[in-house]
Structures are given as C-alpha cells and as structure tokens.
Design a protein with these regions (language model features):
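Boundary at the C-terminal end of the N-terminal hydrophobic targeting segment
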Residues: 17-19
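Active-site-adjacent substrate/metal-binding segments within catalytic domains
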Residues: 22-156, 160
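Polysaccharide-binding and catalytic clefts of secreted carbohydrate-active enzymes
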Residues: 161, 165-188
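Sec-dependent N-terminal signal peptides
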Residues: 4-15
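Active-site-proximal flexible loops/turns
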Residues: 9, 53, 122, 172-176
Length: 188
C-alpha cells in the first residue's frame, strides 16, 4: 500500500512537471524593461510564420485542417529551417491548434506569439459585418473582450505559448476626426 501511494504521488509530480509552462514576465529597473522567461532575460529573435504553399493564400491554404502527417511534414521542414536561422519565436495567428504550438516548442524549442486581429480587418457583431471597427462602441468592446477571454481560456497553459498580441497595426485604416487628432503636432 505504501508503495502504491508513493507511486501515485510520483506519477502526479511527474505529470505536473511535464504540464508546467514557462514563467514569462516583464522586469523593470534603472536600465529599462526586459522580457524574462523562467527568470532569465529573453531576447526575441522572431518572425511572422504561416504555412502557405505555392498556389494558395492565407484563406485557401487551410494548413491546420490537413492531416497530422501533412502538418508534421510541413512543420518539420519549416521549423528546422527557422531553428537553423536562430529564430526563437514565431508569430502565428489565431486558428493554430494549441497542440501544434506545443509540438513546435517541444520539438524545436520555438515559442509562439499568438496574434488575434482584434478587429483590424473589421468584424461581425450580431450577424452584421462592420467594415471599420469602432473601438469606442460598447458592443464592439464587449465583443472583442469576449473573444480575447475565450482565446486565453482556450490556450491557457499551452507549452510554448510565449504571449498574445492583440491587433496588427490597428491604427492603419482608421478614420480619425476630432479635436485630439486635429491638434496632433505636425512633427510627431
């Protein structure tokens, strides 16, 4: 009985150790701010990455809907090249299953910075397409915050997920008017 209890505790500890995710934080001191992973300074050597074979585009490629064999072959080819280039972080977009973020990290040591467009290209609220996102609209705010909460919940504790990025140059394409923008200094 004593051995069974010890074995069970050892099993829980082992499973817990493998389920641990890296501790990511920002430190601030007199020298400035630094990203830290597991207490060590971390310099991002990163790039955007998406698997888009010749003859396809970001919409038609549907890479994550392929069979596991196709996905592994694509990842193994691409990630080994990135690793050889000393890339340590790739920027991917929502839609990548968490298990592939973990696969990339566990096999190649590459972290993922996961990007949610955060309304950059428009969004659908209550079944209505809104081409230009109005971030001051309470319904838009509620919708976007709900999407981010779901994103965080879905990817919580995913090994290899370094951080989230909300938006992609969301200031481009906006129509600004009003005292604040009209009084913006010309030299800035």
């Amino acid at each position: 009985m004593k051995n069974s209890i010890f074995g069970f505790i050892l099993l829980l500890f082992t499973v817990g150790a493998y389920a641990q995710t890296d501790q990511v934080s920002i430190s601030r001191d007199a020298d400035g701010m630094r990203l830290k992973v597991n207490g060590e300074d971390f310099m991002i050597n990163g790039m955007n990455w998406d698997y888009i074979p010749i003859g396809t585009n970001t919409i038609t490629a549907e890479f994550w809907k392929k069979s596991d064999d196709v996905i592994k072959a694509g990842l193994d080819t691409e990630m080994s090249l990135l690793k050889n280039m000393n890339v340590n972080v790739i920027r991917q977009y929502t839609g990548v299953p968490a298990r592939w973020i973990s696969y990339i990290y566990e096999k190649y040591g590459l972290y993922t910075l996961l990007t949610h467009s955060f309304g950059r290209y428009g969004l659908t609220i209550d079944g209505v397409w809104i081409e230009i996102t109005d971030y001051s609209d309470p319904r838009t705010q509620e919708f976007l915050l709900s999407e981010v909460e779901t994103l965080v919940r879905d990817y919580k504790d995913t090994p290899g997920l370094l951080m989230y990025l909300l938006g992609n140059e969301n200031n481009y394409g906006l129509f600004w008017a009003g005292a604040e923008t009209e009084d913006f200094p010309d030299d800035e």
